[in-house]
Amino acid sequence: MNAPTPAPSPVDVIPAPVGLLAELTHRCPLRCPYCSNPLELDRRSAELDTQTWLRVLTEAAGLGVLHVHLSGGEPTARPDIVEITAKCAELGLYSNLITSGVGGALAKLDALYDVGLDHVQLSVQGVDAANAEKIGGLKNAQPQKMQFAARVTELGLPLTLNSVIHRGNIHEVPGFIDLAVKLGAKRLEVAHTQYYGWAYVNRAALMPDKSQVDESIRIVEAARERLKGQLVIDLVVPDYYAKYPKACAGGWGRKLMNVTPQGKVLPCHAAETIPGLEFWYVTDHSLGEIWTQSPAFAAYRGTSWMKEPCRSCDRREKDWGGCRCQALALTGDAANTDPACSLSPLHAKMRDLAKEEAAETPPDYIYRSIGTNVQNPLSEKAPL
């Protein structure tokens, strides 16, 4: 009699994805220096057509995806954004519009509401208009954002304000909280900059010092207590000052997938920075095939790829080793422990790097733009 085949370890079983980040376009009227989009942005001519996006959404629903984040760039720059949103509603997918609120966003909002948009997440670069427009690189953006937010709440749509925090606006954290209350937002994200994409290029310009970060955390914690039942405040702390890393994207290939404007499917925003990974496109494979069979998704899924100290750490199934892209950028090896972790031998050096950059006079922003040959000022620096 043959022995029964042992059941696979729970961490080796491929779970169903929960969320899909649909990067519909990289076009955006804002030029934020912390943008998580890649340095080489997809042009309009390379974007997926409407029918392909509708197929992708149908396949996502079939896989068990519950949430679709309609993002970019600025998703309302797509002329088919209403049709795409309507498809989400038809499939029972919860749709979250991640928007700058400028350009044509307001003009399309009522139509999006009419076809079943579920939620709006509005980026706000600052409270003071001049500062916000300096950060976003677009004049007269703030009044447009306020008009957009007002219409969102008039329609009865739940509104989340997203404020990416850095040294240029960290003093405005109390103001972001007050603004969220004033606008009738249900949720506020106080998200300290995560240094990938354009933020990595601009790290020296964006890095706050530790005392500023600690004070912002204190302010948020006090506001959470004061506004309990009125406003939910999410807080994302900067990795460079953290004790433990975040589970990037909920764990590589465990919860989320990111479809780029040209149809490349990624386990996380910055995965393309890791050399040697083979990414599959929705034009060549179904979403289900990509989720279960793509070499890129398999590369760091689970725990078998881990080195020490991650391999034997009791947190290995909590943070999944942290961010692979950050490990590569700062240590030279994507399989190393994320240096955001206090158990990494390079953790202290990461803290020192942040301290040094925060103490220096910030350089000018390198603004996000399509078609610009960006020279990364950190590219000549050796890893930690």
Curated annotation (Swiss-Prot):
User: Which keywords does this Swiss-Prot/TrEMBL entry list?
Assistant: 4Fe-4S, Iron, Iron-sulfur, Metal-binding, Oxidoreductase, PQQ biosynthesis, S-adenosyl-L-methionine
Q: Which principal EC class is assigned to this enzyme?
A: oxidoreductase
Q: Known SUPFAM superfamilies for this protein?
A: Radical SAM enzymes
Please give the pathway this protein is involved in. Answer: Cofactor biosynthesis; pyrroloquinoline quinone biosynthesis
**UniProt EC number:** 1.21.98.4
Query: InterPro entries this protein is in?
Result: 4Fe4S-binding_SPASM_dom, Aldolase_TIM, MoaA_NifB_PqqE_Fe-S-bd_CS, PQQ_synth_PqqE_bac, PqqE-like, Radical_SAM_PqqE_MftC-like, rSAM
Q: Which Gene3D superfamilies does the UniProt record give?
A: Aldolase class I
- Report which residue ranges the record marks as coiled coil: none
Provide the binding site for [4Fe-4S] cluster. Answer: 28, 32, 35
Q: Name one GO biological process term.
A: pyrroloquinoline quinone biosynthetic process
Where's the Radical SAM core domain?
14-230
What catalytic activity is recorded? Answer: [PQQ precursor protein] + S-adenosyl-L-methionine = E-Y cross-linked-[PQQ precursor protein] + 5'-deoxyadenosine + L-methionine + H(+)
What is the required cofactor set for this protein?
[4Fe-4S] cluster
Cofactor binding mode and count: Binds 1 [4Fe-4S] cluster. The cluster is coordinated with 3 cysteines and an exchangeable S-adenosyl-L-methionine.
How it assembles, according to the record, is:
Interacts with PqqD. The interaction is necessary for activity of PqqE.
Tell me, what does this protein do in biology? Catalyzes the cross-linking of a glutamate residue and a tyrosine residue in the PqqA protein as part of the biosynthesis of pyrroloquinoline quinone (PQQ).
**PANTHER family listed in its UniProt record:** PQQA PEPTIDE CYCLASE (PTHR11228:SF7), RADICAL SAM DOMAIN PROTEIN (PTHR11228)
Q: What is this protein called?
A: PqqA peptide cyclase
Name the species this protein comes from.
Methylorubrum extorquens (strain PA1) (Methylobacterium extorquens)
What gene is this protein a product of?
Answer: pqqE
